[in-house]
Amino acid sequence: MTPRTRADLETIPAYIPGKNFPGAIKLASNETTLGPLPSVRDAIADAAANANRYPDNGHVALIAALADHLGVATENIAAGCGSVSLCQELVQATCNDGDEVIFAWRSFEAYPVVTQVAGATPVKVPLTADHGHDLDAMLAAITDRTRLIFVCNPNNPTGTALTKAELERFLDAVPADVLVALDEAYFEYNRSDADGIELFRGRPNVVVLRTFSKAYGLAGIRVGYAVADPAVVTALTKVHIAFAVNAVAQAAAIASLAASGELLARTDGVVAERKRVRDALLAAGYEVPESAANFVYLPLGAHSGAFAAASAEAGVLLRPYGDDGVRITIGDPAENDAFLAFATSTEARSLANVAVRA
């Protein structure tokens, strides 16, 4: 006889991270190719020297630095072990068994996982034909059991982004007792007019999630944050796992904020490469939604798995999404060229069932 665990865990999908193989070019996990700045590495080393001490569970210095950086009050900020942990904490803080969490699909793969782990019911709303959020359908999906709505902007994995006007109309139509999480993990790559922090102001049912994993290059350290009404922040602290944001992560995040100008300037290069890669794929006959993130998406349908497998054989790792599509991280120019060499080949176009445009 084995110990009993929750029977419903059998129905919960496992989160599948991007793969990695020695010597391969990894364009599967939306990581930045550039490491931390010297000042950030120094902060990491200094914090590691005191690893025998517990971290600050209140994240006081980090929250103060974030408040100054964002122009919000400290009581509006909660920190977490990556923004994905805050996603789960939001579900735990808002939902009882059987309550509903709405999100677009496809969107961030963790949403159905964290929803079901908390005993809530995921409500998946299909994307539009152009691979963006169907906000009207999401509004129509709201019931008296809806407690939380995730809006991933830009959307992962499709890269599509909503405008300020679209989000304002949506947020103003959501009932005041339903929390809306604007998940802005890729905010720093988005050149549209939508800024979750500005949308949060004056809307107590809006929470903004951001991370240091992407543009700040701290994916391996795990630190993210939420900006929310003080009542929501208090609820998050009650479900937060003690000491989850370690001292090294807090120190690295503070140092990264101090160097944010230099770090965020790197995103301009990613945005330029994103356009170059997308233009080349369009010229090769692919459908490529316009992306506002550090990746592009190919909606290849049933051809997705074979395309990603062939790319791996060619030495470039991508992220397939079942029978929906393939996501390609924007790497450095040489990495992107390696992917484009594969994608524009006769073999790849045949696998993807695309033809060269006239």
UniProtKB/Swiss-Prot annotation:
Named cofactor requirement(s): pyridoxal 5'-phosphate
The name this protein goes by in its record: Aromatic amino acid aminotransferase
This chain's function reads: Aminotransferase that catalyzes the conversion of aromatic amino acids and 2-oxoglutarate into corresponding aromatic oxo acids and L-glutamate.
**Gene Ontology terms for molecular function:** aromatic-amino-acid transaminase activity; histidinol-phosphate transaminase activity; pyridoxal phosphate binding
The modified positions for N6-(pyridoxal phosphate)lysine read K214
- Identify the Pfam families for this entry: Aminotran_1_2
Q: Which domain of life is it from?
A: Bacteria
Query: What does the subunit section of this Swiss-Prot or TrEMBL entry state?
Result: Homodimer.
Transferase among keywords: yes
Record bears the keyword Transferase: yes
Return the similarity comment. Answer: Belongs to the class-II pyridoxal-phosphate-dependent aminotransferase family.
Q: What is its EC number?
A: 2.6.1.57
**What's the source species for this entry?**
Rhodococcus jostii (strain RHA1)
